[in-house]
Design a protein with these regions (language model features):
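Rossmann-fold dinucleotide-binding core
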Residues: 1-62
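Helix-loop-beta segment of a Rossmann-like dinucleotide-binding subdomain
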Residues: 5-25, 77-86, 124-132
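NAD(P)-dependent Rossmann-like dehydrogenase/reductase catalytic/cofactor-binding core
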Residues: 35, 42, 91-180
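Inter-helical turn/loop segments and adjacent helix faces that build the functional surface
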Residues: 48-51, 82-83, 151-156
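Active-site-proximal catalytic alpha-helix in oxidoreductases
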Residues: 55-99
């Protein structure tokens, strides 16, 4: 089976994943067809980088932490915009994103370069109007929640207590089967 993996950050045609911290854009692809995919995007005036191995995994993890942490903090504050999270709740975002990045990097066995919080916040400024909500739980925050459940089942402490508490505070229907 042939496949392509993408870590795309395009929300609007005018941002294309470009931020003040990443003027080269953030859209990233990997896999057998990554170069063909990149060519199609570039042909349409968009950016795309081909990355493999840990380099792609790190790009994917940063994107995943971005969407999960910004959405969770925003939802915790009435569904405010990404820009409001970045400007008003920045310390809360930084604490949550830091614990998620640490746990995610450990689970994926990668080292994320310093400055990731600045990169994540810069992208938020580029799409500041984007609304927040916790959606697609199984594929987004659910991945982090599963890391927590696995740790607890193994007799270890919750690696992301801020994340877990925020999920509980929102009264989300969390999958109990993951805990047992």
């Amino acid at each position: 089976m042939d496949s392509i993996g993408c870590a795309s950050t395009q929300i609007d045609s005018d941002t294309d994943g470009i931020s003040d911290a990443n003027p080269e854009g953030l859209t990233t692809a990997t896999g057998k067809w990554a170069n063909a995919f990149q060519a199609r995007l570039v042909n349409q005036g968009l950016t795309c980088h081909v990355k493999n191995g840990d380099e792609f995994t790190i790009a994917m993890l940063e994107k995943h932490v971005w969407i999960c942490a910004f959405m969770l903090v925003g939802a915790s504050h009435g569904g405010c915009t990404v820009g409001e999270v970045e400007s008003t709740y920045t310390k809360e975002f930084e604490a949550l994103a830091s614990e998620m990045m640490t746990a995610g990097a450990a689970a994926l066995n990668v080292d994320v370069a310093d400055g990731y919080l600045d990169r994540l916040k810069a992208y938020a400024r580029a799409v500041s109007h984007f609304p927040t909500a916790v959606k697609e739980f199984e594929w987004r925050n659910g991945w982090f929640y599963k890391l927590t459940c696995d740790a607890v089942k193994a007799g270890r402490e919750d690696p992301m207590p801020l994340h877990t508490q925020a999920l509980y505070d929102l009264k989300l229907p969390l999958p109990i089967a993951w805990i047992n």
